[in-house]
Amino acid sequence: MNLVQKTTSNTIAYEKQLEIVAKEKEYRANSALNYSSIKDFDEHGPLEFYKRHIAKEREPRKESDAMDMGSLVDCLLTVPDTFDDRYFVHTANDTVKGQSKELVEEMFKLTKLHYNEEDGTTSITFGEIFKQAFENVQLDKFTGEQVKFKGKTWESILEVFNGGPMEDFYNSLVENVSKKGVSITQVDMAQNIVKSILSVPCIHDIYNRMDVEIHNQYPLYFEYQGFKMKGLLDTVHINHDEKWVQEFDLKTSWSTLNFGYNRLSHRYYLQEAVYNKGLELAFPGYEIRPRKYIIADSRNHIMPYIGNTTLEHLEQGFLGISMPSGKVYKGLNQLLTEIQWHFDNSIWNTTMEIYENSNEITLELFGE
């Protein structure tokens, strides 16, 4: 689906955006710590962090619908010419819904898990993929009870699958295994969100200023507290004359008017700290200004707006947040200290706090 015609007049721009895509792939392949891995450690604990990011025993976490839409909007907003290199549009996804859609997506997940890029084959048969995917979707993983396709057998659903929309959907996914599949409905929504974003003058200016260098999908690699780290920044302004750098981060959400809570619950303050530190090291002597969020509604109901952060917000990212209830959200510095402790001691099945207190701690008190 060609959203932008690649004519001679925009060939240079297209090549530049392809270069951005190549750098992004290089970024994804780099195993350095980033906001997502540090957030995983904080939210899910050291063992999950180890299995997912060190031992690579876990599949990457599935993005939420809002995050999927955010990535699509980001592409159409900042590197639209590369849409065909990143995404493919399938029509079947609009007709395959509910548990049927879940089954096809689980099949594709297993296909990718066993896929050999060199010869284009899978290490298990299609029948094995279908049966395993069906069981994964049908049965509750804890109780073993049927929660989807109740009373059905995998053989009966295979008959429905063959020659129908489900098979078309699956085939379209497999044919584009290296790309992200989206529906026409999703693309239309993303395009409308982009229009809404650019209709706000102060946001339109971010992507069209002439007095600064503008970089989209800007990769950073650096070291901090003994760790190799990385960040992929949505948009960066650099003013070499006045020596300042401004970072912008696009967030789409179902609840844009309560974004302060989203910043807390999704631990975006950690991302602010990671990116700020990377920019500080990349641009010594420059003023690194606190992040500005570009906040857009995933359903395109609420007008987009800019959410500014301050040096106080940035301090929270490094040092943590203490809530009136007593709940403490750890900052980047403390989390890196704890991660280093786990590496030094090769202990991943408990936390540093529990281990150093001989397996006895006082539980957090909430509600006061």
For each predicted feature, which ranges?
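Short catalytic/ligand-binding loop motif for oxyanion handling, primarily in non-cytosolic enzymes
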Residues: 85-86, 256-258, 301-303
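Hydrophobic/aromatic-lined pockets within catalytic cores
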Residues: 77-82, 224, 237, 252-255, ...
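Secondary-structure boundary elements
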Residues: 206-210, 237-245, 280-289
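Non-catalytic protein-protein interaction segments used by genome-maintenance enzymes to assemble
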Residues: 218-269
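Extended, compositionally biased low-complexity polar/Lys-Gly-rich tracts
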Residues: 166-197, 216, 247-259, 265, ...
